Amino acid sequence: MTTQFSELPNLNFGLTVKPLHCLIHPTITPNILDHYLRKPEDQGDLVVGTLLGTIDGTQIDIFSSFAVPQYYDKEAKALVIDTEYMQKMLKFHRKVNPNEGLLGMYISCKKLDEHGLALMKYFSELFDNEKKKALISFPLIMMVDPTLSDNKLSIKV
């Protein structure tokens, strides 16, 4: 059985939804790939970073990014990110580029697993705590597959 998109119920509860266009500037992708290639071997395949930029109506511009150190805690069986480092970098970035703000995160994966979902939850909480400083009410999640499967770089926002 297949369901046509037009047959699905309207779940926007009467809200107007504008499409957002996302422009990823040229330095972002090499930064993410470099972060992936320089990660410690014991870290696994996952790298995480922060996306920064601007939003103007329906246009999101991702101008900057920075890597966020993380490690896998084997005892707690959880991914731990260096939140203190991330907060310091965000504060520094706001001084250097006051027009750019926090947009979300990047993660090296094809699809979100339990670690990716935990990171997404963390960034959602960060956005809730930084409502005055975040440019949008929800974090963008940019998934990058750095393995270049099929000789293509897969990026999903």
Give the positions of each predicted feature:
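N-terminal beta-strand/alpha-helix entry module and adjacent surface
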Residues: 1-104, 108-157
